[in-house]
Swiss-Prot record:
The chain crosses the membrane at residues 6-26, 39-59, 71-91, 106-126, 131-151, 169-189. GO terms for molecular function: manganese ion transmembrane transporter activity. The gene is mntP. Its main location: membrane. This is Putative manganese efflux pump MntP. Probably functions as a manganese efflux pump. It comes from Desulfosudis oleivorans (strain DSM 6200 / JCM 39069 / Hxd3). Signal peptide: none annotated.
Length: 189
């Protein structure tokens, strides 16, 4: 597999992480280096590990994973999305919104945005292609796109109405990504 093909796959896989990072950038009040590091590290790590897991899973479980991977990604994204919407209606003054770069929310987003990379790993095993170089490029590309998405999102968050409804906009983006994943897997046709 040539370098251009690997990079093309990496960019395509990074798009979900990029979109989620934009939503996270809008959602967060201020973004520090820790936010950048946590989100980029986790998204990059999960994007790099999933092809390796898929590659080792190989043909033995390929059919099972391919049948349900899109549903897993959708339900994880929907779960996080509905929690964000629920939190947006919590009017308490002392209410603090959950940071998408911490805890269970971070892990769920990392898994949901990297499920497609698992399928890529399965494909690489079928093609008898080594997974190590693609996994490295995929992880680094996802981390870079995540940082770019956070930067774009934080700038977009300066728009007053967008800042006020950031959690709902972010939830909508996550739900849209989940629905797009289902559409790409032929659920709606």
């Amino acid at each position: 597999m040539n370098t251009l093909t690997i990079f093309g796959i990496a960019v395509a896989l990074a798009m979900d992480a990029f979109a989620v990072s934009i939503a996270a950038g809008v959602f967060l009040r201020s973004i520090g280096l820790r936010h950048y590091f946590r989100l980029a590290w986790h998204f990059g790590l999960f994007q790099a590990l999933m092809p390796i897991v898929g590659w080792y899973a190989g043909l033995s479980v390929r059919g099972l994973i391919e049948r349900y991977d899109h549903w897993i990604a959708f339900f994880l994204l929907a779960f996080v999305s509905f929690n964000m919407i629920r939190e947006s209606f919590d009017a308490g003054e002392n209410h603090t919104k959950a940071d998408p770069t911490r805890g269970l929310r971070l892990v769920l987003l990392s898994i949901a945005t990297s499920i497609d990379a698992l399928a890529v790993g399965l494909s690489l095993s079928v093609l008898n292609v080594s997974v190590w170089m693609p996994a490295t490029v995929i992880g680094i590309t996802a981390a870079v796109f995540t940082v770019g998405g956070l930067m774009m999102g934080s700038r977009a968050g300066d728009i007053p109405w967008l800042r006020r409804y950031a959690d709902r906009v972010g939830a909508g983006v996550l739900l849209f990504i989940g629905l797009r994943i289902l559409y790409a897997h032929g659920v709606f046709y």
